[in-house]
Regions:
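Membrane-interface interhelical connector segments
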Residues: 138-149, 175, 180-182, 209-221
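Membrane-interface helix/loop boundary segments of multi-pass membrane proteins
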Residues: 123, 170-198, 212
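Hydrophobic transmembrane alpha-helices of Major Facilitator Superfamily
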Residues: 158-162, 166, 170-175, 203-206, ...
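Membrane-embedded glycan transfer/ligation machinery
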Residues: 13, 17, 173, 177-178, ...
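Functionally important transmembrane alpha-helices
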Residues: 1, 191-202, 215-234
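Short, motif-level signal for alpha-helix interfacial/capping segments enriched in acidic residues
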Residues: 146-155, 182-186, 224-228, 232-233
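Specific transmembrane helices
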Residues: 1-169
Length: 234
């Protein structure tokens, strides 16, 4: 049996929530002067391109063996599309103007809080690592890691990579958190809305839980873990 590289599926799926919201707005709000039409049309078109690449990765896989694992030649193409799409994403987002961004949840009013949360996450992550090293009697190793230039190169690479792959992360956050979460919280309350959102978000992962993250026989276990993750992080 020929194995397929299914990595294209989650890459495309991450854009679906935001693309769905944008398509709805393009249809129902087309008379609104504050609608970021160009930005929305581009994102929907980008999603369509990734869907085509995903279908092609199955219909014309052109797989190669990479360390005994299937590697589709469509994988780098998908990466190029995401990187190029992210660059255009930033350009169109900035060109849309503050009023359009503010009207459709594309402009944060609390950057200072976001930066503080990022710094808090980094601080807690490092603290966890320091405690683990201290408990194992390897605290000196932490100092060596932090003094290694490679550590900082990787850190800044991850930072740059976020901006060059932002469309994937934006797809879920805009669709679920900006649009669906407030809608559910309005109908079912703050806690009920978050719990229901987590359930919907978890079920949304079902295809890749069964056919990408794990094998079908382990799909239910993966789906159960998604419920825990999506509800607790919601």
């Amino acid at each position: 049996m020929t194995l397929l590289d299914l990595s294209a599926f989650p890459n495309a799926q991450m854009l679906y929530p935001a693309a769905g919201v944008m398509m709805a707005y393009l249809i129902t709000k087309k008379g609104d002067k504050n609608l970021p039409t160009a930005f929305y049309i581009f994102f929907v078109a980008l999603t369509a391109v990734l869907v085509v690449c995903t279908a092609a990765s199955v219909l014309a896989p052109q797989n190669r063996d990479l360390m005994s694992m299937p590697y589709s030649q469509w994988a780098p193409i998908m990466n190029y599309v995401i990187i190029g799409g992210s660059v255009i994403f930033w350009i169109l987002l900035l060109q849309s103007g503050k009023e359009m961004r503010r009207s459709y949840g594309l402009n944060s009013e609390h950057w200072n809080i976001s930066i503080r949360m990022i710094l808090l996450f980094i601080g807690l992550y490092l603290l966890r690592f320091v405690i683990a090293c201290a408990l194992s009697g390897q605290l000196s190793e932490f100092g060596k890691i932090m003094a290694n230039p490679t550590t900082w190169i990787i850190f800044f690479t991850v930072l740059v990579n976020f901006f060059l792959s932002v469309v994937a992360f934006f797809g879920e956050e805009y669709g679920w958190r900006y649009y669906l979460q407030p809608l559910l919280q309005k109908k079912f309350g703050l806690k009920g809305g978050v719990i229901l959102l987590g359930c919907v978000w978890a079920v949304w992962h079902l295809p890749i839980d069964f056919f990408y993250y794990t094998t079908p026989d382990m799909g239910l276990a993966a789906l159960a873990s998604q419920f825990v993750t999506c509800i607790s992080l919601g």
